[in-house]
């Protein structure tokens, strides 16, 4: 089996190397990852310039594009053999609740939804790599069992791992996405020459993080697995919209 590995932290990220090392003796793994950190890139595709793959000394392929670019090229002609599945991560930082809308890690997995196998996005709840070995172990264990899964086509599994040693993990829970409140306002700042700019600020506080959510699971020491689908249609809104549209045309 052939696995395409991507991420959004960049080709030099320790989480990417940890994921590759965890899977390299299980399948034929190829890494295509952004040359620079592309956190928050979501599902952006680069359309205004050409993309140039670069072979790295460790055998990884770096790309001057987004995480989605990496998977798009990796599945569509960049590689000699088309990968059978896509695994993304390991992200240093959580991708919980609304985070999945912005996450390049999750977006890379979403771009891998057409392979016929589940795509995985792995995230560790820390900006530091101290417990990457825990997330790598979980990634290997889950990917190894993927052929026993019976899921609808184009399912993406977002996996968040608590920042704990493996023997402190309490188990694994299936979860739904929680929700955050509105993000904190951007921070206005002037550079040394007096030109003002803005920094995107931190995510909002947890607003919906009760039992059953991804937030709750990881805070209790459990690995959270949230199945995602591309269809974001809000069907409960149909009734209100139908009455609103009466007599418009």
Swiss-Prot record:
EC class: hydrolase
GO-annotated cellular components: cytoplasm
UniProt remark on cofactor binding: Binds 1 divalent metal cation per subunit.
Disulphide linkage map: none
Stored InterPro entries: SurE, SurE-like_Pase/nucleotidase, SurE-like_sf
Gene: surE
Catalysed reactions listed for this entry: a ribonucleoside 5'-phosphate + H2O = a ribonucleoside + phosphate
Keywords noted in UniProt: Cytoplasm, Hydrolase, Metal-binding, Nucleotide-binding
Any Pfam family: SurE
Major location (coarse): cytoplasm
EC number: 3.1.3.5
Organism: Stutzerimonas stutzeri (strain A1501)
Described function: Nucleotidase that shows phosphatase activity on nucleoside 5'-monophosphates.
An annotated Gene Ontology molecular function: exopolyphosphatase activity
Protein name: 5'-nucleotidase SurE
Cofactor: a divalent metal cation
Membrane-spanning ranges: none
């Amino acid at each position: 089996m052939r696995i395409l590995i991507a991420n959004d932290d960049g080709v030099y990220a320790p989480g990417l190397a940890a994921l590759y090392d965890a899977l390299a003796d299980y399948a034929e793994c190829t890494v295509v990852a952004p040359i620079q950190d592309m956190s928050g890139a979501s599902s952006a595709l680069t359309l205004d310039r050409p993309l140039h793959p670069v072979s790295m000394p460790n055998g990884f392929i770096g790309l001057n594009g987004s995480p989605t670019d990496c998977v798009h090229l990796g599945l569509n002609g960049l590689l000699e053999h088309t990968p059978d599945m896509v695994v993304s991560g390991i992200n240093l930082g959580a991708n919980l609740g609304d985070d999945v809308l912005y996450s390049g890690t999750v977006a890379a997995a979403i771009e891998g939804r057409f392979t016929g196998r589940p795509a995985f996005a792995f995230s560790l709840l820390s900006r530091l790599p101290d417990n990457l070995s825990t997330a790598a172990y979980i990634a290997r264990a889950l990917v190894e069992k993927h052929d026993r899964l019976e899921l609808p086509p184009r399912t993406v599994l977002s996996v968040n791992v608590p920042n704990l040693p493996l023997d402190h993990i309490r188990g694994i829970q299936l979860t739904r996405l929680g929700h955050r409140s509105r993000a904190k306002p951007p921070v206005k700042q002037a550079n040394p020459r007096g030109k003002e700019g803005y920094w995107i600020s931190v995510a909002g506080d947890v607003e919906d993080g009760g039992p059953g959510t991804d937030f709750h699971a990881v805070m209790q020491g459990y690995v959270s697995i949230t199945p995602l689908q591309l269809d974001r249609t809000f069907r409960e809104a149909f009734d209100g919209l139908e009455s609103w549209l009466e007599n418009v045309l």
